[in-house]
Curated annotation (Swiss-Prot):
Polar residues composition-biased segments: 39-49
GO annotations of cellular component type: acrosomal vesicle; cytoplasm; nucleus
Domain of life of the native organism: Eukaryota
Region Disordered, residue ranges: 29-66
InterPro entries attached to this UniProt entry: FAM220A (IPR040355), SIPAR (IPR029155)
Pfam families assigned to the protein according to its UniProt record, in alphabetical order: FAM220 (PF15487)
Any one GO biological process: negative regulation of transcription by RNA polymerase II
Job of this protein: Promotes dephosphorylation of transcriptional activator STAT3 by interacting with both STAT3 and protein phosphatase PTPN2. This promotes interaction of PTPN2 with STAT3 and mediates STAT3 dephosphorylation by PTPN2, leading to negative regulation of STAT3 transcriptional activator activity. May be required for spermiogenesis or sperm function.
Record's protein name: Protein FAM220A
């Protein structure tokens, strides 16, 4: 600094040289610039608007980097603004009554897919519990004697056996028609056939081999009661719901006695 070789000395020397050595003129220009917010370029020397280079010469690089960052920020803000506008438009379109059909259909598809899978699982569980021959189910395998193989539930495939299907409902009425193939539905409801099962299973092996003979309940005795006229009248006078409950109870008892 004393030798005039510092940064301040270099600046003063350059200013003095540009202004012809008149420092008072430079002070007057700076004063007018401070008084006026928008001074004319002629009043202020051009060197005041230029960044002063440091000892390492990094000012121009920093200025370029700063301008590049500003441009990137402006682009990012523009993208965010566009995305926000698109999101607002989507919310408004979903809130209006005139919602696009594509959005509704997509929402319905996404919401109905798990429901269909859940419903299929529930129906499959009901079919396995009742042992009914539901659609798309294959008949269970049996051995040569007609008995189900070890590990197979005997309830699961009883509906396809001809002897069981020939037995009439609680009053001994024969079936009006018997399907010819396995895996088909009977004309009777599943509840009616379920009530027949407790009566027929204890005599499953004793039934004759003639598949055309129609077996009546007069030749079979119920599992849970004696063969009397009073019991037959009681069964005939009860409602369908009570018959189903009694049939389910008999089904459990016959399954336990057969073990």
């Amino acid at each position: 600094m004393r030798a005039g070789r510092g940064t301040l000395g270099v600046c003063l020397a350059s200013v003095k040289q540009s202004q012809g050595g008149d420092l008072d003129k430079l002070a007057c220009g700076l004063k007018r610039r401070s008084e006026k917010r928008n001074p004319s370029p002629s009043d202020v020397p051009s060197w005041t608007d230029q960044p002063v280079a440091d000892t390492h010469g990094k000012s121009r690089a920093m200025a370029a980097a700063s301008s590049e960052m500003k441009r990137d920020q402006s682009k990012a803000s523009l993208i965010l603004h566009s995305g926000f506008k698109a999101l607002q438009y989507l919310k408004e379109s979903m809130g209006r009554n005139s919602t696009p059909a594509a959005s509704l259909s997509m929402a319905v598809v996404l919401s109905s897919a798990p429901s269909e899978e859940h419903g299929a699982g529930v129906s499959g569980g009901i079919g396995d519990t009742l042992g009914s021959d539901w659609p798309a189910r294959e008949p269970r395998t049996t051995d040569s004697c007609g008995q189900y193989l070890k590990g197979e539930a005997w309830v699961s495939g009883w509906q396809g056996h001809p002897k069981v299907r020939e037995v009439g409902f609680l009053r001994g009425e024969p079936l009006s028609a018997v399907p010819k193939g396995l895996g088909t539905r009977s004309e009777l409801s599943y509840c009616s056939e379920l009530c027949q099962l407790p009566y027929t299973y204890p005599y499953y092996e004793a039934l004759p081999e003639d598949k055309t003979r129609c077996v009546s309940l007069d030749h079979l005795s119920p599992v849970f009661s004696e063969e009397t006229v009073e019991d037959e009248k009681t069964l005939s006078s009860t409602s369908d719901g009570l018959q189903i409950v009694m049939g389910l109870l008999a089904l459990q008892s016959s399954r336990l006695t057969s073990l």
